[in-house]
Curated annotation (Swiss-Prot):
PROSITE patterns in UniProt: P_TREFOIL_1, P_TREFOIL_2
TM helices/strands, residue ranges: none
Signal peptide range in chain numbering: 1-22
Species whose genome carries this gene: Rattus norvegicus
Disulfide bonds: C33-C59, C43-C58, C53-C70
Stored Pfam families: Trefoil
Subcellular location: Secreted, Extracellular space, Extracellular matrix; Cytoplasm
Name of this chain's protein: Trefoil factor 3
Gene3D superfamilies: Spasmolytic Protein, domain 1
Quaternary state and interactors: Monomer. Homodimer; disulfide-linked.
Record's note on what induces expression: Up-regulated by hypoxia in gastric epithelial cells. Up-regulated by hypoxia-inducible factor 1 alpha (HIF1A).
KW Manganese (keyword) present: no
Length: 81
């Protein structure tokens, strides 16, 4: 019974995750792609898909019109002491 609950939960998570295609951050941390719309640096071209954008190492977010949807991520900084 526990196995069935596990697979049901996994299926729900996968379905919920795949239903939201506005933001894609494959291989990047979500914090790297939290770039304000007014400072996004274009990383694609007008008809770029989220997959093509991610293959370039860039973030994809089509939820805001009239700004680059494929844009360069923020650089993560390392703390040095």
């Amino acid at each position: 019974m526990e196995t069935r609950a596990f697979w049901t939960t996994l299926l729900l998570v996968l379905v919920a995750g795949s239903s939201c295609k506005a933001q894609e951050f494959v291989g990047l941390s979500p914090s790297q792609c939290m770039v304000p719309a007014n400072v996004r640096v274009d990383c694609g071209y007008p008809t770029v898909t989220s997959e093509q954008c991610n293959n370039r190492g860039c973030c994809f977010d089509s939820s805001i019109p009239n700004v680059p949807w494929c844009f360069k991520p923020l650089q993560e900084t390392e703390c040095t002491f």
